[in-house]
């Protein structure tokens, strides 16, 4: 879910997609930390290659070049190590490395930078995003966690929209929460179609990643009726 309110990250932290009950305390030694990290990295590759249902513990231990005994030192099941994979991966999606945009810059520039960072991180984690969709379809508890996390981002973006409205930089007649839900949902589905199911690969010409950034940014800006940078001193919406 795209985050256009980076400055508000701490106000409503999204819940983890990893079930806390499945996460053990990390090892206390450097060697233990390295071994656990290697297992998690190997598990991610196996899950992405085989899918959650078909992945086996023996596939993970072979990929990590370790024994079953070593695996059970750190994890008790496939569910446990999948939770560890999510714990690591979600940090990349939560903090995708958005380039700095000064607070006084126009809102469109902030939205564009946020969209670019989100889509870049989504592409980097495309295989995992497809895997999450698979798990959500078979695991009600995980689906609920994922929905709660998405809702936190929707609320965060809604606060950002409300701030723009208060500054006269967005259409004041829009309901911030409903608008955020619509635009955030659009972003996640477009990203899933472009990077996971590759729905647009039959189109001519092919949509590039930068095309996607520009298109979704224009949709955000137009939907919110954000004025262009050279008209920031004017209200976003004027009576006719």
Which residues does each PLM region occupy?
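Short secondary-structure transition hinges
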Residues: 126-156, 177-178, 205-206
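N-terminal intrinsically disordered/low-complexity leader segments
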Residues: 1-34, 196-202, 228-240
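Hydrophobic/aromatic-rich alpha-helical bundle segments in the mid-to-C-terminal region
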Residues: 143, 165-217, 227-240
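Short linear capping/connector segments at secondary-structure termini
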Residues: 99-100, 132-140, 200-201, 236-237
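Helical hydrophobic small-molecule/effector-binding pocket
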Residues: 87, 91, 108-133, 152-159, ...
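Hydrophobic alpha-helical connector segments
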Residues: 84, 98-127, 176-183, 213, ...
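Helix-turn-helix
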Residues: 38, 42, 46-80, 84
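Amphipathic, non-transmembrane alpha-helical scaffold segments
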Residues: 32, 40, 82, 86, ...
